Amino acid sequence: MVFFNYATMQMAAKIVYYGPGLCGKTTNLHVIYGRTAPTARGEMVSLETETDRTLFFDLLPIDVGVIGGFKTRLQLYTVPGQVFYNTTRKLVLKGVDGIVFVADSQRPMLEPNKESFRNLRENLAEIGQDVGELPLVLQYNKRDLSNILTVDELNAALNPEGKLDFFEASAANGTGVFETLKGISKLTLRALRSRMSGEARRPTVFASPATPAA
């Protein structure tokens, strides 16, 4: 759900980084935050759990542009990867506009990747969303490590029909992080433009987006 602020003529689209525990979701956001000029991003807020983290911050890339007269801001979230935080994951997914699924390329992580992707589909269905109708890209992370799955193996497991864009990455050193962000931003903004051009009535006004509870 896109949030509109008519006072500042800004709107915010929500992008969620999803995937199994320790796959690199948090690392992606730290790299983006650290390499983006302070004038082009908001403050990063970390809602920590005992074994994992959920992160959130506003981001205003220079090249997002203006849509329908609104300056567009992207809100980037991660979700906790541990199974017992599934309720939190569903809360974070509410109102999502685009998803980056971060897969861990290490060979022993094949089944956890598949299970996490199934979990994504199930959680979206529970909140009335269809994964096939949302902008979604895959990031195959940790390509710099040994004993990793091939891209073909990852696609066979997560992208068998080849319909999803995917990006190879090594988030720990920044490789592929911004390419992934650019990919999901492009799809999300394209969907947003299409949605706005098809709506005849004025959208609901929200003063500001709320940070999800852990």
Give the location of each predicted region.
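Amphipathic helical hotspot of TIR/SEFIR-family domains
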Residues: 108-130
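Conserved beta-strand/loop subsegment of P-loop NTPase cores
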Residues: 98-101, 125-142, 160-168
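Switch I (G2) and immediately adjacent beta-strands of P-loop GTPase domains
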Residues: 44-84
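Conserved nucleotide-binding/hydrolysis micro-motifs of P-loop NTPases
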Residues: 22, 82-83, 106-108, 142-146, ...
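Low-complexity, Pro/Ser/Thr/Gly/Ala-rich intrinsically disordered linkers and tails that serve as
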Residues: 202-214
